[in-house]
Amino acid sequence: MAAAKGTAIGIDLGTTYSCVGVFQHGKVEIIANDQGNRTTPSYVAFTDTERLIGDAAKNQVAMNPQNTVFDAKRLIGRKFNDPVVQSDMKLWPFQVINEGGKPKVMVSYKGEKKAFYPEEISSMVLTKMKETAEAFLGYTVTNAVITVPAYFNDSQRQATKDAGVIAGLNVLRIINEPTAAAIAYGLDKAGQGERHVLIFDLGGGTFDVSILTIDDGIFEVKATAGDTHLGGEDFDNRLVSHFVEEFKRKHKKDISQNKRAVRRLRTACERAKRTLSSSTQANLEIDSLYEGIDFYTSITRARFEELCADLFRGTLEPVEKALRDAKMDKAKIHDIVLVGGSTRIPKVQRLLQDYFNGRDLNKSINPDEAVAYGAAVQAAILMGDKSEKVQDLLLLDVAPLSLGLETAGGVMTVLIKRNSTIPTKQTQIFTTYSDNQPGVLIQVYEGERAMTRDNNLLGRFDLTGIPPAPRGVPQIEVTFDIDANGILNVTATDKSTGKANKITITNDKGRLSKEEIERMVLDAEKYKAEDEVQREKIAAKNALESYAFNMKSAVSDEGLKGKISDADKKKILNKCNEALSWLEANQLAEKDEFDHKRRELEQVCNPIITKLYQGGCTGPSCGTGYTPGRAATGPTIEEVD
């Protein structure tokens, strides 16, 4: 594949599903994966023989829950002892371990224990999205815009960028999901004067509310709020708990400790939840759920709404908070935009509509695809796409949390206020606290609390060599500079000597080192090569199997009676049966062995078959265009649990 210089893709890397789009020929194409789905599960599975990503991984989760990793987005950029990580670990079937304060996922792959950083798991999903785009475009793609929740802090953004690098992508920019949705929306709404838009994004794992003003192609984010831990999965959890209780009542058995049963129940619950968005009742039918018991039951929409009532109602709190932060009355909002699959739930729509006094909600954008759509447009802008559609679009993003430093008494002195438009640069003069102080410790924090101890320490550095002077005399100029990706540079300069020191907050708290990233890039290539070998092996195995079965059916064809000698027929059948028995006993053989076996079989069969067909043919198998030696490559059908 040749790389096309000018193409960049937009990737919505979601907690539960991901989506990829590209802007070409003046419009956005959302790209379907190899299964024909326009969204791909953010799942990676490891087995004894291979690594699976996307639909294939999610489809086998019931059989292999310990080694199927999802929700990497909940781990990325966090510390192991983060309360979010600790509480989520209780719900995950896979094991999370602590390595130097960072969480790693422990799985068994090809018979060995392996531990992966969340960045590596996310990079595998990004690789899948990259390959999906490449299959559609027909050439290699390296440039991408990746989206993150507005609430992500600096280390989470940086870790997401690292995941892109490991996947072999050049990450042009990390942008906020609601901002991306606003772009998708803004394209359709160009030229209507200033509009205030509220974006309500309830996805599989995160919930974001953002208020933007769109004016003449300029987007400005006024406020963001939300809950990093609310989404479709939480609604699934409520259904799972409900049915676990029902199973207890009906069958006096507790299935909650059986991971496979719970996983199968969860899959059925997710399906039921989707059904309830369009029907008032959904049926669940799970054969042999636990100890041979079939579980057939149903749930009404009303019951589902009751089970999730507090979660649904809770979605309005961030709406109110965002309005307060934007200093805006709800009557001032022109448009309410729904993003994320969970916004299809009728009750969620009703609550939001009632809150805005019956206003129409905007559902014109497919809620699953809006974010990737916007990311694809942003990617085109950054690559210098000259088409009229994207020419006049300017994007102003915001800092999700206030940034500042610690001053005397542990006070948080804010330099960049939360919701400030980025990129931005703020400078302030500070001084010494005691006489003849030789240096100052600059400690950088993010957060909204008055005292730094309640906020999040991003990094610290010393500025030394300050000439002796009474307290309050030295002038130390501190500059906070955030770039368009939300990455922070802090510089401190002593005005009298010109001595300076700086820090780029790319996070000591969980940032991967350059060496680690390089190692992971190499690992990713190695895994990809292994996946390729595995695919070739399976193709060779299938080719042998198909050839043997085709030969057996060819010589057993009624139409060939009398045309083939019994000796020849027996020879072929014996050889085919021998090959099939060998195959049965050597499922894990190498590609060369399968190929060798097939060639061996062909040497016996082909001369007989060729002689047969050259000798004229009148049977029903004539004229079917069957060519000996060409293995059938039909679809593989598998049951999904």
Curated annotation (Swiss-Prot):
**Which InterPro entries does its entry note?**
ATPase_NBD, Heat_shock_70_CS, HSP70_C_sf, HSP70_peptide-bd_sf, Hsp_70_fam
Sequence segments annotated as region (Nucleotide-binding domain (NBD)): 3-388
Report the SUPFAM superfamilies cross-referenced here.
Actin-like ATPase domain, Heat shock protein 70kD (HSP70), C-terminal subdomain, Heat shock protein 70kD (HSP70), peptide-binding domain
Q: GO CC: one term?
A: plasma membrane
Would I find Nucleotide-binding among this entry's keywords? yes
Question: Where ATP is bound, by residue?
Answer: 14-17, 73, 204-206, 270-277, 341-344
Any one GO MF annotation of this record: ATP hydrolysis activity
Q: Which UniProt keywords apply?
A: ATP-binding, Chaperone, Nucleotide-binding, Stress response
Q: Which Gene3D superfamilies match?
A: 1.20.1270.10, 3.30.30.30, 3.30.420.40, Actin, Chain A, domain 4 (3.90.640.10), Substrate Binding Domain Of DNAk, Chain A, domain 1 (2.60.34.10)
Q: What biological-process terms (Gene Ontology) are attached?
A: binding of sperm to zona pellucida; chaperone cofactor-dependent protein refolding; positive regulation of protein targeting to mitochondrion; protein refolding
Residue segments, region Substrate-binding domain (SBD): 396-511
What is the annotated quaternary arrangement, including any partners? Interacts with PRKN.
This protein's domain notes: The N-terminal nucleotide binding domain (NBD) (also known as the ATPase domain) is responsible for binding and hydrolyzing ATP. The C-terminal substrate-binding domain (SBD) (also known as peptide-binding domain) binds to the client/substrate proteins. The two domains are allosterically coupled so that, when ATP is bound to the NBD, the SBD binds relatively weakly to clients. When ADP is bound in the NBD, a conformational change enhances the affinity of the SBD for client proteins.
Family, per entry: Belongs to the heat shock protein 70 family.
Q: What does this protein do?
A: Molecular chaperone implicated in a wide variety of cellular processes, including protection of the proteome from stress, folding and transport of newly synthesized polypeptides, activation of proteolysis of misfolded proteins and the formation and dissociation of protein complexes. Plays a pivotal role in the protein quality control system, ensuring the correct folding of proteins, the re-folding of misfolded proteins and controlling the targeting of proteins for subsequent degradation. This is achieved through cycles of ATP binding, ATP hydrolysis and ADP release, mediated by co-chaperones.
Tell me the protein's name: Heat shock 70 kDa protein 1-like
Whose protein is this, by species?
Answer: Sus scrofa
